[in-house]
Amino acid sequence: MDNLFTFLHEIEDRYARTIFNFHLISCDEIGDIYGLMKERISSEDMFDNIVYNKDIHHAIKKLVYCDIQLTKHIINQNTYPVFNDSSQVKCCHYFDINSDNSNISSRTVEIFEREKSSLVSYIKTTNKKRKVNYGEIKKTVHGGTNANYFSGKKSDEYLSTTVRSNINQPWIKTISKRMRVDIINHSIVTRGKSSILQTIEIIFTNRTCVKIFKDSTMHIILSKDKDEKGCIHMIDKLFYVYYNLFLLFEDIIQNEYFKEVANVVNHVLTATALDEKLFLIKKMAEHDVYGVSNFKIGMFNLTFIKSLDHTVFPSLLDEDSKIKFFKGKKLNIVALRSLEDCINYVTKSENMIEMMKERSTILNSIDIETESVDRLKELLLK
């Protein structure tokens, strides 16, 4: 981890990170993080009864548990704004909301109606789909006009699905769904699977998302603010997430180790100089501290922050290159999966930029109208 941050610091005058996803590999000695969090979230409907430590309440916006049988969101109401009457309601026509109408539940309903949550994304996506029933096409081919085509409504306790079809092409279906949601206190519950993955999610107020899988491996999607400047800000954001995440684990799992790690993490946060932060991270790696010793890069992107004032020559890019140009002048390096990958493509990017500058200078010095076609091809296509 320290070597990665050292290199990102070396290039931060030219490149800035955009997407940054990473994993914390599960460790047997830590215990069943997924199982214990699942048990706590499943059995409670108040945020305070899940997250006891009030010192970290400001950092956590929502907890989500999703498996085949149940999807449950627990929201931290204090992290949401007070809505006025003109606040847009995003999802009423997709959901039947059942609530006990208490003050706490009513506030949760208000938030749910206005927030673009994963439930809203799921139901909107499934409503948009037009589906071709290939089985019914086969019936048409082999069975003629007597083939049976399904349209109508099918539903269970929590999900109503309406299937419509065109009389001229009855095998093409338009599918609309409406979901029942039960809201009690801080909890938003629906039955059945509403995601591809079975995970627990912790959504932070800074938009970072931590996904915990069944084996307690974690996938962390680190958010980025517009005012993030350089590697030191990135380290602070990552270790801020670590600090609050590990105190949450200590809260739920009752493992003092996480409190100890949170204290070590806090030293990185309070250090003011980048060199000191990197030194502390290196020491954590040497002592096999959780969060550093089991850190693994998932994927990250870099963007070239300087302006490209010369002509861009796309022909210099390999077909499978991770260097991409967007909107003609925006150079990004995408889907980097290791420090070695990063160093390799930054080097290629630097060399390519120099070659483009040279070609651009030559191109600007010649008369395009009188220059030979072969010479122009050599400049533009090779």
Curated annotation (Swiss-Prot):
Keywords noted in UniProt: Activator, Early protein, Phosphoprotein, Transcription, Transcription regulation
Upregulation: Expressed in the early phase of the viral replicative cycle.
SUBUNIT field: Heterodimerizes with protein A8 to form the virus intermediate transcription factor (VITF)-3.
Record function comment: Acts with RNA polymerase to initiate transcription from intermediate gene promoters.
Family per similarity comment: Belongs to the orthopoxvirus OPG150 family.
UniProt name for this protein: Intermediate transcription factor 3 large subunit
The organism of origin for this protein: Vaccinia virus (strain Copenhagen) (VACV)
Native organism taxonomy: Viruses, Varidnaviria, Bamfordvirae, Nucleocytoviricota, Pokkesviricetes
Name of the gene: OPG150
